[in-house]
Amino acid sequence: MLHKIYTLNLNFEKNFKNYNFHNLYKELLNFCTVDLSAFYFDIRKDTLYCDPKVSEKRKSTLLLLNIILDSLLKWFAPILSFTTEEIYQLVSKSKKSIHLEKFTDFPKKFENINLYEKWSKLIQIRDACNLSIEEKRANKEIGSSLEASLEIELNKELYKIFKDVDFAELCIASSVKIKQGSEKEIKVLTQKATGKKCPIC
């Protein structure tokens, strides 16, 4: 996500200097709807609600959310001047205006092409899992994705990258089993998980 913010900020500065407001707005809208709403917020809400306050994962999530909020306020300030000012006055300890702030100059270490490419592939796997889950939902076999138990078959290339990734969290599923297959495409088998879903979840 930091890599995405880094590259988006570079594109924003370029589009802003060239008065290319259409592309500027389009990239910001895509970031908010696809990267944040449909992905990051979806997989991180349980961390915020359920993990202890001292959890390192929860702390890093909060830190990133603050970076995202600060970035979005500055990016949207030229477009949504009154809205961003109201939010800025609510969250900022400074008495200045958002329109007096400088755009953030993110450190080069935020750029990580290898990690970005890895996560692009992981999201590809997640999309295949979501498609399989939606088919079960359409057939009324499951309700929430948390009622799903997944078996994923990956080719050799994709199988290498799943280590250190909690696919149950990534796919918001009850459990996930992964095995290596010989086929090029991703295969996903979705079944109704055993046990009962938490009523709070």
Where are the predicted features?
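Short cysteine-rich clusters marking metal-coordination/redox-active sites
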Residues: 198-201
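Hydrophobic residues within the alpha-helices of tandem HEAT/HEAT-like
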Residues: 32-33
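Acidic, turn-prone loop/beta-hairpin segments
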Residues: 1-13, 41-132, 139-154, 177-188
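Short helix-adjacent coil turns
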Residues: 16-23
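Aromatic-lined ligand-binding clefts that engage carbohydrates, nucleic acids, or primary amines
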Residues: 25, 29
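Short, flexible, mixed-charge glycine/proline-rich loop motifs
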Residues: 187-195
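A glycine-rich helix N-cap at a beta->alpha junction
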Residues: 164-178
